[in-house]
């Protein structure tokens, strides 16, 4: 009988998170160490998670004893843009549970983070992974690793049957599946199989722990929170995206050059993404809206600025599977470089399992609301309708109503 898909402890170390949480955390340490934030959990499909509160709380409390060991620190020290002062801070870092509020409110699971951005930032990914795995092991207690592995090999067979050797040689795929994974063991098995047997080009994982354990590249730059926080970090709202990109450039000096475009909308982003940023950043990440239409806007923007799109890369990460990735790849091949970050469809695609649709998003920074409008109406998020309306007005974004 194959190994169980579950381990008793869900999050084993500080590196069991997405790489961009560390890159943003360094940016926060150096630029906004005093910023205060609030985050709220949302289950987008209304699933009743109340029965799992006790187990979630138990796993949450175990985060408090996690530390960085010498081997993990040595791995991070080999990453040139992670600075010594940040690594010293990380060596001392502990999860502080006083910033986490969890319980039942309005007949549903309630989870809020409130505290210094620097100390709250690492909670998001492990908390989502805990909620996902606790729910999955209650619904599917006898799941074995072999079922996830077999499903992945079926996908490889499909890809070999539908893509040419030339296409496979260029098709770049990464694991972006930490936060909504079936379990930590399943994600590790998926990453190992991708590393060893993926028929295309497996380029890395967003999970820092797996990058360390499996000797693969950690991937990620920035998330929505980086741009959202800048809505309340000093500049005028109209200048907030520019401030976020400019701060990133000053922090990383041309490294980690993939910018996220849909915090407001792609059109609003391109209005701020001038020749300076377009030359400095290596490319853009898509996370909402129709991907090929979005890519056409990016290509046209680069061409208008006199930049050859083949010197830039588009990273796609919005609810992808291998089938959709191949379609996008074919639509854009030879016009701009592309790469695909696949999450839930790699780490929680098992026959009979419905993946969760859960998010934990920043709602406030320094006591004032922040918002994500995005290129997809369902992904708009803000606790303050007036602030969303004001932001739409400032950035000339029409209402999706």
From Swiss-Prot:
Keywords: Ligase, Phosphoprotein, Pyridine nucleotide biosynthesis. This is Nicotinate phosphoribosyltransferase. Pathway: Cofactor biosynthesis; NAD(+) biosynthesis; nicotinate D-ribonucleotide from nicotinate: step 1/1. GO terms for cellular component: cytosol. Gene3D superfamilies: nicotinate phosphoribosyltransferase (3.20.140.10). GO terms for molecular function: nicotinate phosphoribosyltransferase activity. Transiently phosphorylated on a His residue during the reaction cycle. Phosphorylation strongly increases the affinity for substrates and increases the rate of nicotinate D-ribonucleotide production. Dephosphorylation regenerates the low-affinity form of the enzyme, leading to product release. It catalyses: nicotinate + 5-phospho-alpha-D-ribose 1-diphosphate + ATP + H2O = nicotinate beta-D-ribonucleotide + ADP + phosphate + diphosphate. Its EC number is 6.3.4.21. PANTHER family: NICOTINATE PHOSPHORIBOSYLTRANSFERASE (PTHR11098:SF1).
